[in-house]
Amino acid sequence: MEITLFDPIDAHLHVREDALLKAVLRYSSEPFSAAVIMPNLSKPLIDTPTTLEYEEEILKNSSNFKPLMSLYFNDGLTLEELQRAQEKGIRFLKLYPKGMTTNAQNGTSDLLGEKTLEILENAQKLGFILCIHAEQAGFCLDKEFLCHSVLETFALSFPKLKIIIEHLSDWRSIALIEKHTNLYATLTLHHISMTLDDLLGGSLNPHCFCKPLIKTKKDQERLLSLALKAHPKISFGSDSAPHFVSKKHSASIPAGIFSAPILLPALCELFEKHNALENLQAFISDNAKKIYTLDNLPNKKARLSKKPFIVPTHTICLNEKIAILRGGETLSWNLQEIA
């Protein structure tokens, strides 16, 4: 059995920087046609020049791959700065509530403040797409749910602004995207295939720790059903986020799952298991093209076959290991060719 996926798109990707970028980028740039690149670096991408500099670093270390750049939402995003970004082809803003995830210490503290709303108004006028890490302070399993009032306010206040709920993780959020025409979402491999049991049901597995948390069986099943039917308001976004094993085994574990090396084989396995392979093309590419109005992307064909693939346990950077999701396991699908 074989399947060919055309122009795979990752609508949420972390490729880090410097040596780590060089070590992990190929896992995404080779099989994927394009990816929405996250701006929460150690020095956040808060303006056009730093974003373009980072884009150039990605382009120098890849080929036939389109990084779709995003700006880190901050008070310095004046109308003039947004216009400058737009002129350079930057179409995405990423809003991080302060302290909610990795490198979000510079995030937005007042989500409904006057400055935030002013920036969103300008973003709407210019046709930007708002991507949001939709969590609010509160009990860890309710953080996304607690952000619903903010999401509703955004959706109603800015009806022409496309708003993406990144890495949807709570089944209660599904009603929001079905209620509001301008609300969309991305889904990760880990949120549609894993639960809290994978993180802490046996021994604590730090390599399954991410934000937002993987949640209950009910959440996983409801989100998986969206993916399997390629819900038209949902696109695939891996949120692949590599960390060194030494950090993952420390007393203060950073959030992030490095899934990039297994994405296409694991998705094929999952969709085949549920008799939904015919919908994988829409989930992995077609929906994103429509939602984000993407065209002129590099042409890619990823051919996969139903042959065993033993997942490497890790990759190496600077003599340090980076653990790969499902490392050591055997997947039933294998990436055979990229053209």
Curated annotation (Swiss-Prot):
One of the record's GO cellular component terms: cytosol
**What role is this protein assigned?**
Catalyzes the reversible cyclization of carbamoyl aspartate to dihydroorotate.
The record's family statement is: Belongs to the metallo-dependent hydrolases superfamily. DHOase family. Class II DHOase subfamily.
Q: Which cofactor does it need?
A: Zn(2+)
- Return the protein name: Dihydroorotase
Q: Which residues bind Zn(2+) 2?
A: 94, 133, 167
MF terms per GO, please? dihydroorotase activity; zinc ion binding
